[in-house]
UniProtKB/Swiss-Prot annotation:
PANTHER family: ARGININE--TRNA LIGASE, CYTOPLASMIC (PTHR11956:SF5), ARGINYL-TRNA SYNTHETASE (PTHR11956). One of its GO terms (molecular function) is arginine-tRNA ligase activity. HAMAP family: Arg_tRNA_synth (MF_00123). It comes from Staphylococcus aureus (strain MSSA476). Transmembrane segments: none annotated. Keywords: Aminoacyl-tRNA synthetase, ATP-binding, Cytoplasm, Ligase, Nucleotide-binding, Protein biosynthesis. One of its GO terms (cellular component) is cytoplasm. The keyword Ligase applies. This is Arginine--tRNA ligase. InterPro entries: aa-tRNA-synth_I_CS, Arg-tRNA-ligase, Arg-tRNA-synth_N, Arg-tRNA-synth_N_sf, ArgRS_core, DALR_anticod-bd, Rossmann-like_a/b/a_fold, tRNAsynth_Ia_anticodon-bd. Monomer. It catalyses: tRNA(Arg) + L-arginine + ATP = L-arginyl-tRNA(Arg) + AMP + diphosphate.
């Protein structure tokens, strides 16, 4: 339990003891503690006096006064109490309790903020999963940044997280990739008789693959068409996936599993789920096609599994894949989908229900569109290539840290304008620079302290920490673990970037209000330990969203 929860629990216990002592109720109702919107109204407030009105048959302000009169303020860490309005009780805490967070942060280091107990739940988090047919773009970048941050947050909150990338290496798009490579392969050999398929891939990378294969494996030209296309499928996917993996690794995004769609066919899992759905009576034949009764589970219409030409729709292997996720022992399935996949939510949930799996175990987040902005105008095409701007170009333009930070600053269900000019600015207007500068500034102060012979663990008396800005800063440090818990519960990576901005802001305010290194050696020791706790918190929070914490800038 974190220090904030401990204090709130103690306050609730002492209020309950006070109610008993005052004889206000035989059975005490639920005591709710809230943080007032206006800090002038205290650190915490409760409406328990009004809740007790009917039970105690007294005026709520009288009840509030009785609670106050019988409260053990020392145990509750309370230095002042006000009764406001019809009977709200506002508590102002003795903030020395907050200083306990300083040695805790220093002792835990990289683990500070992480919960100690496992949730005992396995989470499979699938994100990015871009088709291996071209470069990653800004939409994939947002998916990668949010997905990786969410995996870090859930892990810190005590979940057992598996990060997974689903490789769409089967289906029409891979056939089109193979046909496109075939055309470029023969062109490189001087044979222009092979035309590009209607839905082919015309990117520069396909030309390069064709040339490379023509140089290294010219013998492929003598293969049968079937064998040739099989080879181009395999080599094309390998080439594209190697490039995607390299870009994602540079973007500080890593996966535990790379799950191949082809493996579902090789292990006959698609046939298995199809047979199971038929056995359960959820499929039917109509218009020469095989349908799934998803309307039985709140979908707006039934869905085709097998088309009238005998080929599978994309939906059927998707069902097999998600059923495989369940079979692997995962309690929670989280998918991060692009904005064009909104219609998939109900049908995927319905498909799980056909197997008796609670569809609430599947959570789907839709990543809304990102616009790249420069000088107030949208940038759609790369000036260098004339094509859509790739993740690699974004990394080259603004850097990994800025890209990761900016792409996790907003809720994924909201559209976002990525200001590339702002992301490159070395000023406090740039959110990531502002946060990293706070960390670098702390490192600079700690270096000066060390030169004066003051170590971060030297303090054992924190009573000298009385400055209002210092207290507010410590409150923010103490709020780190609850913020992680909240971000995990709501699957909201942007709660961490919001927290980082607040923490950096509180540090800068403290720094501008009071000197850290002073002639008062005991006060200096306390301040040095405090800012080390802030530094650890800031570094851990930045790491959670995949951003570095530089020691100098």
């Amino acid at each position: 339990m974190n220090i904030i929860d401990q204090v709130k629990q103690t306050l609730v216990e002492e209020i309950a003891a006070s109610i008993n002592k005052a004889g206000l109720a035989d059975e005490i109702p639920d005591i709710k503690i809230e943080v007032p919107k206006d800090t002038k109204n205290g650190d915490y407030a409760t409406n328990i006096a009004m809740v007790l009105t009917k039970i105690a048959k007294r005026n709520p302000r009288e009840i509030a006064q009785a609670i106050v009169d019988n409260l053990d303020t020392e145990k509750a860490h309370v230095k002042q109490i006000d009764i406001a309005g019809p009977g709200f009780i506002n508590f102002y805490l003795d903030n020395q309790y907050l200083t306990a967070i300083i040695p805790e942060a220093i002792e835990k280091g990289d683990q500070f903020g992480h919960v100690n107990e496992s949730k005992g739940q396995n989470v499979l988090l699938e994100y990015v999963s871009a088709n291996p047919t071209g470069d990653l773009h800004i939409g994939h970048a947002r998916n990668a940044a949010v997905g990786d941050a969410l995996a870090n947050i859930l892990t810190a909150a005590g979940y057992n997280v598996t990060r997974e990338y689903y490789i769409n290496d089967a289906g029409n798009q891979i056939t089109n990739l193979a046909r496109s490579i075939e055309t470029r392969f023969f062109e490189a050999l001087g044979d222009n008789s092979y035309s590009m398929p209607e839905d082919g891939y015309n990117g520069k990378d396909i030309i390069e693959i064709g040339k490379d294969l023509a140089e290294k494996h010219p013998e492929i030209k003598d293969y049968s068409e079937e064998a040739r296309l099989k080879e181009f499928r395999k080599l094309g996917v390998e080439y594209e996936m190697a490039k995607l993996k390299n870009d994602l690794a540079e973007f500080n995004t890593h996966f535990d599993n790379w799950f191949s769609e082809t493996s579902l066919y090789e292990k006959c899992e698609i046939l298995e789920v199809l047979a199971k759905m038929k056995e359960l009576g959820y499929t039917y034949e109509a218009d020469g096609a095989t349908w799934l009764r998803t309307t039985d589970f709140k979908d707006d219409k039934d869905r085709v599994l097998i088309k009238n030409d005998g080929t599978y729709t994309y939906f059927l292997p998707d069902i097999a894949y998600h059923f495989d996720k369940v079979k692997r022992g995962n309690d929670i399935l989280i998918d991060l989908f692009g904005a064009d996949h909104h219609g998939y939510i109900n049908r995927l949930k319905a498909s799980l229900e056909t197997f008796g799996v609670d569809s609430n175990r599947l959570e789907i987040q839709i990543m809304q569109m990102v616009r790249l902005m420069e000088n107030g105008k949208e940038v759609k095409m790369s000036k260098r290539t004339g094509n859509a701007i790739t993740l690699r170009e974004i990394m080259d333009e603004v850097g990994v840290d800025a890209a990761r930070y900016f792409l996790t600053m907003r809720s994924p269900d909201s559209h976002f304008d990525f200001d590339m000019e702002l992301a490159k600015e070395q000023s406090q207007d740039n959110p990531v620079y502002y946060a990293q500068y706070a960390h670098a500034r702390i490192c600079s102060i700690l270096k000066q302290a060390k030169e004066q012979g003051i170590e971060v663990t030297a303090a054992n008396d924190f009573t000298t920490i009385t400055n209002e800005k210092a207290i507010e800063l410590l409150k923010k440090v103490a709020d780190f673990e609850p913020t992680i818990e909240s971000a995990a519960e709501h699957r909201s990576a942007h709660r961490i970037t919001n927290y980082i901005q607040d923490l950096a802001s509180h540090f800068h305010k403290f720094y501008n209000a009071e000197k850290v290194l002073t002639d008062d050696i005991e006060k200096t020791k306390a301040h040095v330990a405090m800012i080390e706790a802030v530094r650890i918190t800031l570094k851990n929070a930045l790491a959670m969203v995949g951003v570095s914490a530089p020691e100098s800038m």
